[in-house]
Swiss-Prot record:
A GO term from the CC aspect: cytoplasm
Protein's name in the database: Peptide chain release factor 1
Species this chain originates from: Chlamydia trachomatis serovar D (strain ATCC VR-885 / DSM 19411 / UW-3/Cx)
Record key words, sorted: Cytoplasm, Methylation, Protein biosynthesis
SMART domains, sorted: PCRF (SM00937)
Pfam families assigned: PCRF, RF-1
Similarity comment: Belongs to the prokaryotic/mitochondrial release factor family.
Domain of life: Bacteria
Length: 359
């Protein structure tokens, strides 16, 4: 890891020289690219300095502890060593994650689709809980969320919830949320105190960039239907045909949007989802053709694959792909997902590039 840090620090000096050149402003695109690289490298530098300083304090405490005789001071130093060791471990993981080379698609916005699976009303309620969890996580990362489409269940929660999320490194941290999320808990309507199991499926679809030439949709290939939007229980909530259903005839992909009162806005949102789904289908097809990529994936990303279990009675969350088990489910449901998402990103990087690059 030290070698990688030195390489980054050397590159940071080069970038700072390039940015300080007045001629750089004549090329806005290059300036923007260098500014982003400078921010990433500066973060690595700061994290490395924090780690070095913490290691020095820990070393001093251990040295003092080896010669100290006073019981009170010994107890204080022992506590300092314990705190220092935890800090070194945490800062090392943080630095390791920062050293992961950025993917050009890391900053792409994503469309996240959550659907109730097995478990009926309880599954729909858990969709609502997951929606809240992801909104809180997004807020903690400074990301923006936009509701694209919802289908409420009769007893609360959602049969389906689709939202767009944008911001720095959105795709990097959310792409591995795709799959089946299983929940084990006692429903509020359960009188015998029995634990029920239900499931929610999650799809994470990167939105194509505006200049992405891979995604071209011919208007001739679309069938667009309009109808009155309806809420929970099927009752109509709008007297005009504002809801939109778009069918991409060649692929058979169908997208419905009815949350907005404006037909124009519903159509625009539906087109965003449609483009993301078509792009995702192409990406999945290429991934399946690349055996090297398949072997390095954290699971298949298939919605039918069970990736995580949320056990409320035990306050436990387990990610089955990397064997990670945490006993702080309450914190995870409050949006503290970094402890899982960063572990997944690190795991994938180690598989793709080998542990020696970050060790």
């Amino acid at each position: 890891m030290e070698i990688k840090v030195l390489e980054c620090l050397k590159r940071l000096e080069e970038v700072e020289k390039q940015i300080s050149d007045p001629n750089i402003f004549s090329n806005p695109k290059e300036y923007s690219s260098l500014s982003k690289e400078h921010a990433r490298l500066s973060e690595i530098k700061n994290a490395h300095e924090s780690l070095v300083a913490t290691k020095k304090i820990l070393q001093d405490d251990k040295l003092a502890l080896s010669t100290e005789k006073d019981p009170e001071i010994v107890a204080m130093l022992e506590e300092g060593v314990l705190v220092g060791e935890e800090a070194v471990e945490r800062l090392s993981k943080q630095l390791e994650n920062l050293l992961i080379p950025p993917d050009p698609d890391d900053d792409l916005s994503v469309i996240m689709e959550l659907r109730a699976g097995t478990g009926g009303d309880e599954a729909a309620l858990f969709v609502g809980d997951c929606v809240r969890m992801y909104h809180l996580y997004a807020a903690s990362k400074g990301w923006q969320c936009e509701v694209l489409s919802t289908s409420e269940s009769d007893l609360g929660g959602y049969k389906e919830y689709v939202m767009g999320i944008s911001g720095a490194s959105v795709k990097r941290f959310l792409q591995y949320e795709a799959g089946t999320h299983r929940v084990q808990r006692v429903p509020e309507t359960e009188t015998q105190g029995r634990v029920h199991t239900s499931a929610v499926t999650v799809a994470v679809l990167p939105e194509p960039a505006e200049d992405d030439e891979e995604v071209f949709i011919d208007e001739k290939d679309l069938r667009i239907d309009t109808f009155r939007s309806s809420g929970a229980g099927g009752q109509h909530v709008n007297v005009t045909d504002s809801a939109v259903r778009i069918t991409h005839i060649p692929s058979g992909v169908v997208v419905t949007c009815q949350d907005e009162r404006s037909q124009h806005k519903n159509k625009a949102k539906a087109m965003r989802v449609l483009k993301a789904r078509i792009r995702d289908a192409e990406v999945q097809k290429r991934a399946q053709e690349a055996s090297a990529m398949r072997s390095a994936q954290v699971g298949s990303g298939d919605r039918s694959e069970r990736i995580r279990t949320y056990n409320f009675p035990q306050n436990r969350v387990t990610d089955h792909r990397i064997g990670l088990t945490l006993y702080n489910l309450d914190r995870v449901m409050e949006g503290e997902l970094d402890m899982i998402t960063t572990a997944l990103v690190t795991h994938v990087h180690r598989q793709l590039f080998g542990h020696e690059e970050t060790a």
